[in-house]
Amino acid sequence: DVCSSDLAGVACASNVPIPGSSAITDGRAGHTLIDLGDDEYTAGRPHPMIEPAVRDAALAKALADPATGVVLMDFVLGYGAHADPAGHLISTLKGWSAEATPIVASVTGTEQDPQRRSAQIAKLEARGILVTGSNAAAARLALASVGLH
């Protein structure tokens, strides 16, 4: 529970019901967790696991915002998932610098998945994305990168 335990006492807003968080408002202040797979972003469109382009505009906006301290992402592999989610992300990162805004990621899948977990991780790491072994570890690293854990 990122907002109520790891960020105790720190303002946190989200578009999904996370214990300890408030709803996102237009005048964002503090830390924000946005689930781009939520119905709000996928209505009439495929989930980002299937079509990662669904999150391209929101990601570009976050990376262009000097107030963004870190971007936390997860990639889910398997049948029905995008053929190359890491490759898609990398193709959208023209001009991105890990020093400016780090991206922390986790990859859920196996070597038996069509996308091969190790191949996806290698692509992300080669581009400077910090990859952890689980989404919980990625959340902790994202918190640490902005001095909160």
Which sequence ranges carry the predicted segments?
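Short, small-residue-biased leader/transition segments that mark boundaries at the very start
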Residues: 2-4
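Charged helix-capping and loop-helix junction motifs
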Residues: 85-92
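Glycine-rich, charge-decorated loop segments at or immediately adjacent to ligand/cofactor-binding or catalytic sites
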Residues: 104-125
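A short helix->loop->beta-strand "cap" motif at the edges of active sites that frequently abuts
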Residues: 98-102
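Short acidic-hydrophobic, aromatic-tinged amphipathic segments that line or gate anion-handling sites
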Residues: 130-138
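Active-site rim loops that border cofactor/substrate pockets in soluble metabolic enzymes
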Residues: 15-67, 75
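Glycine-rich, proline-tolerant flexible connector loops at the mouths of alpha/beta enzymes
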Residues: 75-83
